[in-house]
Amino acid sequence: MDGKFACGRGRNGRIMRGNIVRSEEWVVMRYSSVLDLHTHTVASGHAYCSLREMAKVASEKGLEVLGVTEHAPGMPGTCHQYYFDNLRVVPREMYGIQLLLGSEVNILDARGTVDLPERTLERMDVVIASLHIPCMKPGSKLENTESYLNVMKNPYVNIIGHPDDGRYEIDYEALVQGAKEYGKVLELNNHSMEPDCNRQNAVENDREMLELCKKYQVPVVMDSDAHFDLLIGEFDLARNLLEKLDFPDELVLNRSVDAIRRYVNRKI
């Protein structure tokens, strides 16, 4: 039932949303979410809200965990490495929710080089690795795929961010099998599927990725990629695609804190 949602309460009483599934006797929620691990504040340079504003809205929307993953220094206009080195001074709980503070690092080449040093990465609560046009120009299908597979070897990288951008042609079979081998999570990025997003062919690429994740039992996480507080936890497009594919609920890590715990660097 695309586009229709149910509300229910998590263990802490907060409201969660998910797709409605009906039978003759009951209604259950599919793809409910207690977390959003990919968001940005003003520190990223092209986002519009403070950390407090983001945390407050996340709490009001019923999330239990908010990941704040500022763009790493290779992205024009973002914060310096010193920002990430100093995250130790920021509390990990605000407005009753847990914060995972980290970075969306930029993959810089086919070797999987990223733009923060290991001594900084090892202190991050969560690390997303992504391809961005200002930081790495699209290469061949092999080169683009190798960039993902090599960054997966980095022990501090947890999530592969928006691997759905058709400007970077990749081998999705290799991507999914690599995620399984290295224990990484593939992101289903809601923003990628929005009509005004610059990423190309995202829905079709996400569909292919999800079918392979289903085949090989590889987990995914829905993320908003919010650059404004009201977009936190907005996963309607991602949920609808999951529903169309009848994607297994147990492979969507948003369902509970327990589900995501082993995939992030700071234990929650």
Stretches with model-predicted labels:
Residues R52-L66, N86-E93:
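Alpha-helical scaffold segments that flank or form the walls of functional sites
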Residues V34-S44, V68-H71, I160-D164, S224:
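Histidine-centered catalytic micro-motifs
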Residues R30, A72, G77-L188, S192, ...:
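Extended substrate/RNA-proximal surfaces in nucleic-acid metabolism proteins
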Residues H71, V218-I232:
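Short acidic/histidine-rich active-site segments
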Residues G45-Y48, T78, E169-V176, D196-L212, ...:
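Histidine/acidic-residue-rich catalytic or RNA/ligand-binding cores of hydrolases
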Residues W26, E64-V65, G77:
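Extended recognition/assembly regions associated with phosphoester-bond processing machinery
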Residues G3-E25, G233-I268:
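Mid-to-C-terminal alpha-helical segments outside catalytic/metal-binding sites
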